[in-house]
Swiss-Prot record:
Biological role: Involved in the maturation of [NiFe] hydrogenases. Required for nickel insertion into the metal center of the hydrogenase.
Molecular function (Gene Ontology), one example: nickel cation binding
Name of this protein: Hydrogenase maturation factor HypA
Keyword match Zinc: yes
Residues engaged in binding Zn(2+): 73, 76, 89, 92
Alphabetical UniProt keywords: Metal-binding, Nickel, Zinc
Gene behind the chain: hypA
Amino acid sequence: MHEMSLCEGVIEIIEREAQQQNFAKVRTVWLEIGALSHVEPEAMRFCFSAVSHDTIAADARFEIVSVPGAAWCMACAKTVPLKQRYEPCPDCGGHQLQVTAGDELRVKELEVD
């Protein structure tokens, strides 16, 4: 379960921002998770509640923003939707695709006190 180490990284980001921005409590964490990132949202929820215990984010709401997958098809010269990495272009069936969205995992926003 790599989600545990990912959540530990999220806590590190939050603590670093708390020092830099001078806040003492996190009310809400918004995390963007791309459809192609191989991260399970429910596992992230579980792991975040486990690793945030005894931190400034202990009682924070954990909101997940889902980012759909998309890629640039070189053959079609346009952006196409992707449900899974390495699937063919839904329009031409080609495999010359460059992922443009959906592989991210990032802290989008924090609501703090």
